[in-house]
Amino acid sequence: MPSATPTDIERRIGNHIAELIPDGATLQIGVGGIPNAVLAALTGHKHLGLHTEAMTDGVLPLLKSGVIDNSLKRVMPGVTVASLALGSRRLYDYMDYRKDLVMKDVAWTNDPFRIRENPRVMAINSAVEVDLTGQVCADSVGERIISGVGGQHDFMYGGALSEGGKTFIAIPSTTPKGESKIKALLTPGAGVVT
């Protein structure tokens, strides 16, 4: 699966979020342009950890440069933890036979009470649309499903419980066609994820 290349707007959003992430944070990164933009903006950070459901190509530069070293995590310190990988051959080759990377089942990785054990969890996700009541739709456009239900809710909950944790749902305000992604109410049939 090729990595989503961030747009200009997504890069600006990613830069804003990166400014809010402290050194020593433990990251959970969703999939898509904005999460990749956040990762690209973290190259000057230190001692980041990674405890995430989906591992993508976007983490490779931070792992290879040592920005992600997992040294300050409380859950499996020194080790990157994920449940699945979505990426290129480069990602899979990097992951092959690594002692500093553990793939766990999703029930273990996405347990909010395990997630919260790490300090400063930064849960960074995106959405299809949000509404003014705070509902988040991340996996459908109306009734049309575009992805499976993932661990966004688990990480938003665990991140909020984490000491010094922060959670982010980041979206451009409009679609490429100029339609608002922020609605009074979600599109009828839209699945509420968070």
Cite the ranges covered by each PLM segment:
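Conserved phosphate- and dinucleotide-binding cores of soluble alpha/beta proteins
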Residues: M1-T194
